[in-house]
């Protein structure tokens, strides 16, 4: 289950040494594939042929998706944390709902 969304700033927790510990914003989430695109991480070079819309063609750099297990969100202290889920009762309606929370600080991540 993917517990990340586009509003979270995250840190890359594993992988190549040049990218481990990098902090960036989650640009896109692919829940079916359990992958996310993080800004500035896993940048790949794509070669494009010249076409009518792109006269020159050439090389373009784009971020490629990485697995969600390699990404951790950043809590309010600026440290990498894990995400948990707990049921909280809504005081207005009396109904319970699931919320995501940071394991290190215990603060809720959902608005």
UniProtKB/Swiss-Prot annotation:
Cellular compartments per GO CC: ribonucleoprotein complex; ribosome
Ranges of Basic and acidic residues composition bias in the record: 48-65, 86-95
Source organism superkingdom: Bacteria
InterPro entries: Rib_uL2_dom2, Ribosomal_uL24, Ribosomal_uL24_KOW, Translation_prot_SH3-like_sf
One annotated GO biological process: translation
GO terms of molecular function: rRNA binding; structural constituent of ribosome
Described purpose of this protein according to its UniProt entry: One of two assembly initiator proteins, it binds directly to the 5'-end of the 23S rRNA, where it nucleates assembly of the 50S subunit.
HAMAP family listed in its UniProt record: Ribosomal_uL24_B
Subunit structure: Part of the 50S ribosomal subunit.
Record-stated family: Belongs to the universal ribosomal protein uL24 family.
Protein name: Large ribosomal subunit protein uL24
Organism: Salinibacter ruber (strain DSM 13855 / M31)
